[in-house]
Amino acid sequence: MRMYDIILKKRANVPLTDEEIRFVIDGYVKGDIPDYQVSALLMTIVFNGMSARELGTLTLAMAQSGHMVDLSSIDGITVDKHSTGGVGDKTTLMIGPLVAACGGKVAKMSGRGLGHTGGTIDKMESIPGLKVSLEQDDFIAQVNKIGLAVIGQSEGLAPADKQLYALRDVTGTVDSIPLIASSVMSKKLASGAQAILLDVKVGSGAFMKTLDDARALAKAMVDIGNENGRSVKAVLTDMDRPLGHAIGNALEIREVIDTLKGHGPQDLTHECLIMAAHMLVLSHICDYETALSQVQDALDSGEALERLRLMIEAQGGNIHVINDESLLAIGKFTYDVTAPQDGYITHMNTEQCGIASVMLGAGRTVKDGPIDYSAGIVMHKKTGDSVICGESIATLYASDESLIPNAAKTYVEAITFGTTAPTVVDTILDIVE
């Protein structure tokens, strides 16, 4: 079997066999196939796409290039959730406790912030003492005991994906639905969960800017799951405005706790309840209507908040953050962004809002760079809200006062004002299954 022939075959838009796909991934990881040949194949995939079978095989081969987590010793169906990345997206830390409180088994491996989007692991590390790295046996034992564990992704997961992504990044092959889908799902397959809920963000703060592109990505990822015996569902959610009120790390943990106490923003609460209900359905615990009722009860009764407390305790964190938000760091320098006129906020460039938060220190400007857990933004007004000239629409927080002016300028430029109230869409845009 020759890589040259495989490239020519795919260039002619002839589907590759499972053996050919595995040959490519195995050879590339071992160093037997050079970058320039894999680059050529990637470009043929960009132009010609892949069938559901090809994509399923490619993704499994990528997953099997490294450690495959075995969760079979967890009682019940294990369920995972993945977000394609957004601004103010702290949903994992609400949905996990909601699902666990209703009998689900949430075994979640999460990532760090990427570009303008935040990362669940960064947010969790703003809780004093909390560990985001567990041995596999401890991870499994925790899920069996309290129904929930969230840890950082292992370096050994899907190494082929890491190699391929680095190559795609410099060869103009990042923007491809099949290649994006295989990248995401290779790590999900390797993580071991039997059921996966995908939160595919759409809009100015998402990597998928249009609903059509988001649907295509969602369908590709669901197909990959089906090809590999996983139960997968995708929820398409709006990211034309940040989710909730807080952007940052400790600020978002404060909002998670407030929301699980029943005092959170309506959009965040609504989105989390719906996604948690879908995860219960994927777990074969109950039907959707029953699931909605159960997760609402878990929120109202405080049982979901208790599951968050149990997870923090199990992972070595300070459980007193639940009732004492002063234990969660907040930037000592603040600045209020004010409305320049009476009227409404008619649009938010959500990506720019996320960038403003990064500029305050809440995200990284270089890989593995430092992060300020206390920095970020609390929004008092969002798209569709009425404003009065001079009132605060957002408060910026930073530990370094010199970072505020440029971040404030970026945030101001992200907001559009008008005299007519805009139409605000529901946060849930579509379901793909």
Regions found by a protein language model. Give the residues of each.
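Acidic, glycine/proline-rich low-complexity segments that act as flexible tails and inter-domain linkers
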Residues: 1-88, 307-318, 432-433
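A glycine-rich helix N-cap at a beta->alpha junction
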Residues: 123-149, 219-225, 229
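Short beta-strand segments
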Residues: 109, 143, 151-154, 199-203, ...
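Alpha-helix C-terminal capping segments
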Residues: 47, 93-107, 187-192, 227-228, ...
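Glycine/serine-rich anion-binding loops at beta->alpha junctions
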Residues: 77-100, 104-116
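Short acidic, glycine/serine/threonine-rich loops at helix termini
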Residues: 92, 110, 117-122, 154, ...
